């Protein structure tokens, strides 16, 4: 993972309305194994976070100046240290306006992964721990706690520069349960939500369910293809990459690699060729299966409570919205 530029600043602030004190670094961090390891661990932690949002920059303005400074840096009108300095001063101002904000070390990193360039910005905090020193004494030890990553954003610079119609070149961590504590950080980046990750994922899963029903796939085949979809999408979320519909289609059916993709294109699902999958939504798409005495039942977990109702005391399932093929067979049997 080639790191182009990296720098860390410190904003000292407590969530009590006190002033935010900036301790800015003047020069970039020199390349080192420690920096490589830090960024690799940060990427892993960020990719694993659930509940991220995807979007795009607001139009450049006095309220949202970040994208303009970033463009000046990419156009080589500002060096990286200068860009990060004006950005961190803006973040300091927004922190002071947000009484609930807490300071910390702010990392700016411009790096490349594969053929794609990214800018990562993260507010990092320390945790207290212990270590054993060379004399085998147990001593206090402070370390950056990447497991408690609550404020971070990543800009896909390549996508931003090369695809003006994209609405998902920025990802950022959203506040839990609608909390407004992180709003100042989103305003700092100047980001607006452009893609509803959970909604897009639900639409993708709906399209897949429709595809399975339309193809009238055997239970084993449906289960295998469901697992393929979930495994691929989960892997993409871990890598911080979107789900590519054409690639997914080829994995679902190697003999007919375009079948699922054509199903999506020919129906009114409104999905983009690439979508940011939501891990929490994917976890709801597991299948329940059971077989006994000539009876075989298989359904997706997210249908439980809507189309499928389970009565634990009675040991029964109530299924609503039966497949058309099954209804036709039952009618013919009755006749």
UniProtKB/Swiss-Prot annotation:
GO molecular function: double-stranded DNA binding; single-stranded RNA binding
Predominant location category: cytoplasm
GO cellular component, one term: bacterial nucleoid
Subcellular localization: Cytoplasm, Nucleoid
Alphabetical UniProt keywords: Cytoplasm
Similarity comment: family membership: Belongs to the YejK family.
Protein name: Nucleoid-associated protein PSEEN4449
Organism of provenance: Pseudomonas entomophila (strain L48)
Taxon lineage: Bacteria, Pseudomonadati, Pseudomonadota, Gammaproteobacteria, Pseudomonadales
């Amino acid at each position: 993972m080639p790191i182009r530029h990296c720098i860390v600043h410190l904003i000292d602030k407590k969530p009590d309305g006190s002033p935010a004190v900036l301790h800015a670094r003047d020069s970039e961090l020199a390349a080192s194994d420690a920096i490589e390891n830090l960024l690799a661990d940060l990427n892993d932690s960020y990719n694993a976070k659930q509940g991220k949002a995807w979007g795009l920059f607001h139009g450049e303005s006095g309220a949202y100046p970040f994208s303009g400074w970033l463009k000046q840096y990419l156009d080589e009108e500002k060096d990286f240290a200068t860009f990060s300095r004006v950005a961190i001063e803006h973040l300091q101002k927004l922190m002071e306006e947000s009484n609930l904000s807490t300071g910390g070390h702010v990392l700016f990193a411009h790096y490349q992964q594969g053929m794609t360039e990214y800018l990562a910005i993260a507010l990092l905090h320390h945790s207290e721990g212990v270590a054993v020193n060379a004399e085998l004494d147990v001593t206090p030890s402070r370390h950056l706690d990447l497991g408690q990553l609550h404020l971070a954003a990543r800009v896909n610079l390549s996508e931003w520069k090369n695809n003006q119609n994209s609405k998902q070149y920025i990802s950022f961590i959203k506040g839990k349960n609608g909390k407004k504590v992180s709003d100042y950080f989103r305003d700092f980046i100047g980001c607006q939500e452009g893609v509803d990750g959970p909604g897009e994922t639900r639409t993708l899963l709906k399209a897949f369910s429709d595809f399975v029903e339309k193809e009238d796939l055997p239970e084993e085949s449906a289960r295998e293809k469901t697992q393929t979809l979930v495994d691929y999408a989960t892997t993409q979320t871990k890598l911080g990459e979107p789900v590519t519909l054409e690639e997914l289609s080829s994995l679902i059916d190697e003999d007919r690699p375009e079948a699922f993709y054509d199903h999506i294109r020919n129906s009114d699902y409104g999905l983009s060729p690439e979508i940011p999958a939501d891990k929490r939504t994917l976890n709801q798409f597991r299948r329940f299966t059971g077989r006994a005495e000539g009876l075989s039942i298989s359904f997706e977990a997210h249908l439980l409570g809507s189309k499928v109702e389970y009565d634990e005391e009675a040991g029964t399932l109530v299924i609503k919205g039966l497949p058309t093929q099954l209804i036709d067979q039952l009618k013919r049997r009755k006749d």
